[in-house]
Amino acid sequence: MRYRTILAALILALGAGAYAAADPPASISMLNVSFDPTRELYDDYNVVFAAYWKKKTGQSVTVQQSNGGSGKQARAVIDGLAADVVTLALAYDIDAIADKAKLLPANWQSRLPYNSTPYTSTIVFLVRQGNPKHIRDWNDLVKPGISVIAPNPKTSGGARWNFLAAWAYALAQPGGNAESAKAFVTKLYKNVPVLDSGARGSTTTFVERGIGDVLVGWESDALLAVNKLGRGRFAIVRPSRSVLAEPPVALVDAVVDKRQTRTVAQAYLQYLYSPQGQDVIARNYFRPRLPSVARRYAGEFPAMKLATIAQFGGWAKAQQTYFADGGVFDQIYQPGQ
């Protein structure tokens, strides 16, 4: 109910009220620092939002994009990249910006509906047409001779979702526990020949360079590959268990106040929740939040059994346990071995 109330208020705000500034400039620019697989989404959305904003306020807005591995993008903002908004792969990366650089408040997730996640996704497998290696589930990825393409959890948000999805699968097996899950992901990463820094790099490795038997990654990138990048060359395999990936968005307060872009940057994030924004999201293969839009695209996004980040104790605990220096990933992955 709380999210519905906030969402209703946002939609009301989008439809009413004039631009707050007395004499806004005729044109304005802003920077969206995002994670790897959202390139097409925001290329599309930025055009739609600019048209909406021009009609509403008379002001022209240019949205510049920066895309890369979510962890690397967060570090760039911490180190001084002046993002008006960040749209990253997971909450921990925006928490890091709040904690280390103090560029936005610690309660940033409470400012927009659904904990500031206007879309979701999950982790699936992309295989070559005909599925020549007969890959059906996570257990097939640990078989000898299977080449798995996946990005690096130290730099990529999607890679961290990959890791947790595999861990959740292992835990769900008969007798599954932390020890057996660790053994399972150890075997899995032994089949990964190279770790790209970001999810899109891994997609390029698999789709364009023809390396590997299976790509583990974002559902959005898999759908993009099947429908556009390599039509007729690939197929999606949905594992028996995956993870609910919730990529969040946030206003970077210190930047928008310095650059006087708060009003347009705030509207930019709010419009993601509008029917028009949600349609752009779904067209670009992310799962929309708005039920009316989700129903129209239900065939594209079948129901799956998904673990949640809450089952790992939240992102702060998951990051410390699995991905921090000396954590589980460092313990199980040795490059070249």
Which role does the model predict for each range below?
Residues 46-55, 78-82, 91, 98-102, ...:
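Sec-exported extracytoplasmic/periplasmic mature domains
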Residues 1-29:
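Short, low-complexity disordered leader/linker segments with a strong preference
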